[in-house]
């Protein structure tokens, strides 16, 4: 009898065969081994049986990791082992987290840890969809109050046709990279980048992915049933309804009034004062029954319901706007003298200082993946310091949120960047959020577009971004343009759209409730289009196309072509020649096998100096031309004279003077500089020189 109680489920998901398995590996956790095509991911879920005392939030942690052995590789670095999570791993962790988090009920505070490990990969496709499906299956058998399962799908668009779960080869031809996740009845999460696609094309991709994932959801349900998954016995905590009614009677009107204060810090101060008043009124001095915690919860719930009721009843939003109005905008470019490109983009109380820096190919980011090492010529780094929201905090490396927001902003800009052969600079954008009250990632998109044009980067089109929100109760709903931080926190959807006047370049959607219909998504997309066009119009008043020249402080780029046979002369023995040129001119030089030479100089003069040295090395000797040469060796029958780097010719004794000489050393000595004329170059490349009738300096 086997020591393993293995449960398997196989199903076809688009072009890939999927196998779910449990009971063989990591049996002390709720574990699923999922194989999808050539990718295998081990997903382990561990849930604490009870919440920690005093816990007032849901501690869900998702860690996605790629083991290098999965692709038959040994990690780099001194220790030769996997280190901290890469940016790609962090982004995939967020991708898994976002659709499962809203499916746990309010009040469930038991700690849950999800670990998804890629253990095998044929390097033909991403492992994220397999990891998401594996997580869904592991949660389905974990006995937690998870209202799943979820399905997930990647959607591409090739030649106008949607493609389900495309591989790397197909993605290279696709105009769209969209990941959608959801339940049987609703879409929960969308993450995408696109090449300026229409709203209809994007909505169609979301609906296509949701329809196709139903087979995965059905298979996971059948898998969980076969594994004997038991329903959770967790019961939601009851709340003091009498206290809720008293709080509402005493504070609903006051909270509603506080939410008419437009300035965020003043509004927060007023709400904090009301909360303190509620605590003083309803919490006894000796709080043995935990009334303080109940007041905290019910007060937050009252704030939530008050703002939502105001919006749905048609009242002005927190800052006095209607549902479609974008906050006041201020657009400035060229705000930093030495930066290659800079912009200060302000939208209400959200502000981003965005810079563009241009570098040479050696500044490219080296990215280590399961498929191997690749170079990335475009970087966008997003920073969210504590001071941007008027708080103190410890400065550290980028957190998951910053990495995620930076990637979203990058997606919004990438589609409009020029091709590398047209603009071969490495581009680094940094967005420093200096103020924040909602939609800082979309402010980063706007600022990035502005700073790129200020730097002289020839964009295909300017881009802008806007964050949309939703409040929905029953059949009533309101879509909000350009949401505040409070509206994001108190709303049901965070819907971010970036794009140009021609179409969408990035779409991100996170939905906290079920029941978001096609109609609501269509309304949100169309309303976002109107908002995006308004923002673009305001940006275009300041700058609408790239400056004609790059910044005088940016490196100068030049391209020349040399004879491929001369490449080794430019490089020199052991790289000595090219290294000397680089050190002398401070220019970076890249040479391709076809003879294309790219020169990046810190200044235009540096680039020109490097090119002059390269051309001197690679120049072809011209018969009849006079050269400045140096005697490098004297022999009995003449002298060898260097006329160009790496090029020597023979000056025969009979060609040294118009008069007959007996000894070469009577006229010449080694190291002497002379003017010589090329008489002839034979078919073997040997050069004959003369000094006759050539006036010497």
Swiss-Prot record:
<keyword id="KW-0479">Metal-binding</keyword>
<dbReference type="GO" id="GO:0006402">
    <property type="term" value="P:mRNA catabolic process"/>
</dbReference>
<dbReference type="InterPro" id="IPR027408">
    <property type="entry name" value="PNPase/RNase_PH_dom_sf"/>
</dbReference>
<dbReference type="GO" id="GO:0005829">
    <property type="term" value="C:cytosol"/>
</dbReference>
<dbReference type="InterPro" id="IPR015847">
    <property type="entry name" value="ExoRNase_PH_dom2"/>
</dbReference>
<comment type="subunit">
    <text>Component of the RNA degradosome, which is a multiprotein complex involved in RNA processing and mRNA degradation.</text>
</comment>
<dbReference type="InterPro" id="IPR004087">
    <property type="entry name" value="KH_dom"/>
</dbReference>
<keyword id="KW-0808">Transferase</keyword>
<dbReference type="Pfam" id="PF00575">
    <property type="entry name" value="S1"/>
</dbReference>
<keyword id="KW-0963">Cytoplasm</keyword>
<dbReference type="GO" id="GO:0006396">
    <property type="term" value="P:RNA processing"/>
</dbReference>
<keyword id="KW-0694">RNA-binding</keyword>
<dbReference type="Pfam" id="PF00013">
    <property type="entry name" value="KH_1"/>
</dbReference>
<dbReference type="InterPro" id="IPR036456">
    <property type="entry name" value="PNPase_PH_RNA-bd_sf"/>
</dbReference>
<keyword id="KW-0460">Magnesium</keyword>
<dbReference type="InterPro" id="IPR003029">
    <property type="entry name" value="S1_domain"/>
</dbReference>
<feature type="domain" description="S1 motif">
    <location>
        <begin position="624"/>
        <end position="692"/>
    </location>
</feature>
<dbReference type="InterPro" id="IPR036345">
    <property type="entry name" value="ExoRNase_PH_dom2_sf"/>
</dbReference>
<dbReference type="Pfam" id="PF03726">
    <property type="entry name" value="PNPase"/>
</dbReference>
<comment type="function">
    <text>Involved in mRNA degradation. Catalyzes the phosphorolysis of single-stranded polyribonucleotides processively in the 3'- to 5'-direction.</text>
</comment>
<comment type="similarity">
    <text>Belongs to the polyribonucleotide nucleotidyltransferase family.</text>
</comment>
<dbReference type="Pfam" id="PF01138">
    <property type="entry name" value="RNase_PH"/>
</dbReference>
<dbReference type="InterPro" id="IPR020568">
    <property type="entry name" value="Ribosomal_Su5_D2-typ_SF"/>
</dbReference>
<dbReference type="InterPro" id="IPR015848">
    <property type="entry name" value="PNPase_PH_RNA-bd_bac/org-type"/>
</dbReference>
<dbReference type="InterPro" id="IPR001247">
    <property type="entry name" value="ExoRNase_PH_dom1"/>
</dbReference>
<dbReference type="GO" id="GO:0000175">
    <property type="term" value="F:3'-5'-RNA exonuclease activity"/>
</dbReference>
<keyword id="KW-0548">Nucleotidyltransferase</keyword>
<feature type="domain" description="KH">
    <location>
        <begin position="555"/>
        <end position="614"/>
    </location>
</feature>
<dbReference type="Pfam" id="PF03725">
    <property type="entry name" value="RNase_PH_C"/>
</dbReference>
<dbReference type="GO" id="GO:0000287">
    <property type="term" value="F:magnesium ion binding"/>
</dbReference>
<feature type="binding site">
    <location>
        <position position="488"/>
    </location>
    <ligand>
        <name>Mg(2+)</name>
    </ligand>
</feature>
<feature type="binding site">
    <location>
        <position position="494"/>
    </location>
    <ligand>
        <name>Mg(2+)</name>
    </ligand>
</feature>
<dbReference type="GO" id="GO:0003723">
    <property type="term" value="F:RNA binding"/>
</dbReference>
<dbReference type="GO" id="GO:0004654">
    <property type="term" value="F:polyribonucleotide nucleotidyltransferase activity"/>
</dbReference>
<dbReference type="InterPro" id="IPR036612">
    <property type="entry name" value="KH_dom_type_1_sf"/>
</dbReference>
<dbReference type="InterPro" id="IPR012162">
    <property type="entry name" value="PNPase"/>
</dbReference>
<dbReference type="InterPro" id="IPR012340">
    <property type="entry name" value="NA-bd_OB-fold"/>
</dbReference>
<protein>
    <recommendedName>
        <fullName>Polyribonucleotide nucleotidyltransferase</fullName>
        <ecNumber>2.7.7.8</ecNumber>
    </recommendedName>
</protein>
<dbReference type="InterPro" id="IPR004088">
    <property type="entry name" value="KH_dom_type_1"/>
</dbReference>
